[in-house]
A protein has these predicted regions:
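A conserved acidic beta->alpha catalytic loop
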Residues: 27, 43-52, 96-97
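A short, conserved alpha-helix in the catalytic core of glycosyltransferases
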Residues: 152-153, 157-160, 164-169, 174-203
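Short aromatic/hydrophobic "clamp" motif used to bind/position activated sugar donors
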Residues: 89
Length: 295
């Protein structure tokens, strides 16, 4: 990729969420930013014309793109990033918004002050005001408003340096749904990255109740398929087998309880059929570095 100009490209991917998108764009009208910035909006093959939402927003720095097919969240984000002009990529879900007008100011400042890090996680809250899908462990809850190194981020609200994003090949679009965040961090560590920098001073409201997750058979399929794939291609061979046995049995028990054995078998089968793109496998030392990021 060509060198990027100084600034922020805010990437939004939407699909059939006109009202959510309208609200998100409305919140961006008062956003403060200390550098040039743009909004890249990707319509991921919605059933209706989403361009009218963009026109109605009146946002002059918004650029609209539409894909001809549903690329899934990781593919849609990759497409949006490929259109970006600036060196810092910030991703936000279409049903989310920053809490506070100075979020981009904080992001820009943090990324400038932490040159050793490429991936930045934010604090994500739900409609009740609680934390949304806090992945960093209970021991870090007292530091939710502070900073720390971690191995997790939520793709619905995070930032990454464009140069590093493309050095990693972006998100693994072949996953289509679920697990792309973990996969990106594993690729980053495999190539010598420093993990993820969490900045709790940047807050995102994900406009859902609770953790917003509904246990359904479709999600279960992608969990089985993608986790088995990620473990196989990212972890050292022997350790990969141990992890796959553990999760294989875990998902099997779940499938038996829920009556989803057919879906379980299909997920296992399809995990072996996902095409590989590039090779970023952790060494044993980098796997240990990944594990230490949870402590």
């Amino acid at each position: 990729m060509e060198p990027r100009d100084t600034g922020i490209s805010l990437v939004l991917v939407t699909r059939n969420r006109e009202s959510d998108l309208t609200r998100t764009l409305e919140t961006l009208k008062g956003a403060l930013c200390p550098c040039p910035w743009e909004i890249i909006l990707v319509d991921n093959a919605s059933d209706t014309d989403m361009s009218r939402v963009c026109k109605a927003s009146g946002l002059e720095n918004l650029r609209f793109f539409r894909t001809e097919e549903n690329l899934g969240p990781p593919g849609g984000r990759n497409f949006g990033a490929s259109q970006a002009r600036y060196e810092y990529l910030v991703f936000l879900d279409d049903d989310a918004n920053f809490i506070g007008e100075d979020a981009l100011v904080r992001i820009y400042d943090r990324m400038n002050r932490e040159p050793d890090f490429a991936i930045f996680a934010f604090q994500v809250r739900n409609l009740e005001g609680g934390l949304y899908n806090w992945p960093h462990g209970k021991h870090r809850l007292p530091r939710k408003d502070g900073t720390f190194r971690t191995k997790y981020f939520l793709a619905g609200g995070f930032a990454i340096r464009a140069a590093w994003f493309w050095a990693l090949g972006g998100f693994s679009s072949q996953l289509f749904f679920w697990g792309e965040e973990t996969d990106l961090v594993l690729k980053s560590l495999a190539l010598g990255g420093e993990g993820v920098f969490y900045d709790g001073s940047v807050a995102v409201l994900h406009r859902v109740h609770g953790n917003g997750r509904v246990k359904d058979e479709g999600r279960f399929y992608y969990q089985v398929r993608n986790r088995m794939y990620i473990l196989k291609i990212r972890f050292p061979a022997g350790i990969s087998l141990c992890y796959r046995l553990y999760y294989g049995l875990k998902y099997l028990r779940e499938a038996v309880c829920l009556g989803w054995l057919g879906t379980y078998r299909r997920g296992l089968r399809d995990s072996r059929r996902i095409p590989r793109k590039g090779s970023c496998r952790l060494t044993l030392s980098r796997l240990r570095a990944w594990q230490k990021l949870s402590k």
